[in-house]
Each structure stands twice: as C-alpha cells, then as structure tokens.
Amino acid sequence: MVPGVDEDAYGTRKRLAFASALISAARPRNVLDFGCGTGLQLTMPLAARWPEVRFLGVDADATSIEFAKTHCTAPNLSFALAAPPREGERYDLIIASEVIEHLEAPGAFLRDLESRLEPGGRVLLTVPNGYGPFELASLAYDALRAAGIVPLARSIKRALFGAASARAPDTHAFSPHVNFFSLDELRRGIASAGMKVADFRPRTVLCGFGFDYLIRGRRLNAWNAALADRLPPQVAS
C-alpha cells in the first residue's frame, strides 16, 4: 500500500494500491502516465513510493500540467504537455487512468499505447462502467444542472459538510465522457489493440453526484470498495 492517500467514494486509494502492487510485481524501469491530470492522486504518490523508477506524466490540459510541475518534488518524476514521440523511448508500464472514455477514437489510442511498450510491457487501464451507478448519477447531475438546481445543491453541500469536503483535483480540464463501455466491450477493444487482460479489479459501487455526499468516512468508503469485490463486475462503477 502507498501511504498518504485516503480512500473515497471513487476508490482512489484502492486504485493506487493496485498500481503499486503491479509495480512491485513487474519492477518496471520506467512508467508513462498518459492522461496524468494534476498527478496528485496517482503519479506523484507512485513516484514517491518507487524512487528507483523513472516516471513521466503527460496530459493535454496545460493548466493541469502547470499545476503538476509546480507541486512535483520527486527527482524521478517529470511532466510534459505533449506525449513523447512514438519512435522515442519505450516503456515497461503505461498507465491510462480515466482516459479512453473521453476520447473520440479509443481504439486508435489503445493501439498507440501498445506500440509504446517494451517487449513484455504492461498497460494499466482504468475505465468507469458505462452503465454503472456513476454514469446514472452523472445523468441525474446533468438534469439538475439543466434545471438550474446544481448551485443550490452545492450551497447545501457547503452548509452540511463545509468547503473543505471537496476531493483534491485530479484534473483542471472539463472533458465529458463520450464513450460508455461495458466490460465485454472493453475487453474486445483491448484485444483489437493486440493486448489481453491479465487482471481485473472493480473499485467501488456507489460514487458520483449525490453518492459523494453520502459515502463519507473511512468505514463507509472501505465498505463501498469491499462491496465492489463481492458483487458482479457489471454492478461496479
């Protein structure tokens, strides 16, 4: 486990533990975090835990990368706005966490990741369930926003939980989901890119608008993460 990151409704600590366990088993020399955002929730904690591994975080959002560079202290970690050239360095591990659901051409992106791997390299991919509770909560949020109710909901949240209840920003970009994958669709897309699924782990069940206010505290967050391991993967977020 990597210390310093609390669990939340999104399974942030569970994701970090999975990534750390993968690094422990695979012992990569270098890691590319494609779509790293601010780096706060994954790239930076991993680089701090594994100082012998070189990490590069890249993202298309300039504000997120500037934030990451400002807050980066690990000598084995760097950030860049543009992806490295395809003919450049190959990587033992590539992370693409919460990325392909935002892309117009996810298949091409997965093939690009595969082309950047060293022989025997691995990709760590995290993707929301396109038909799970999170996406349903997002639909409810969009409906409330269209009705002009979201500002009221935020005011109620601040009154109940305080301004400090927000999660640390994983990105400063606004990028809506344009893809909604089922697990079977995701497996087929991975296979079409010339890769295979070696391991799979659901993160949580209840997250997103509304659930963020209800699933709070260590016990509830731990229960939410454990629940995802006990239910069919189609139910997880």
Task: Give the ranges of each region predicted by the language model.
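S-adenosyl-L-methionine-dependent methyltransferase catalytic module, highlighting the catalytic core
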Residues: 2-13, 60, 71, 104-116, ...
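Short catalytic micro-motifs in class I SAM-dependent methyltransferases
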Residues: 98-102
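Conserved N-terminal segment of class I S-adenosyl-L-methionine
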Residues: 1-89, 93, 97, 107-110, ...
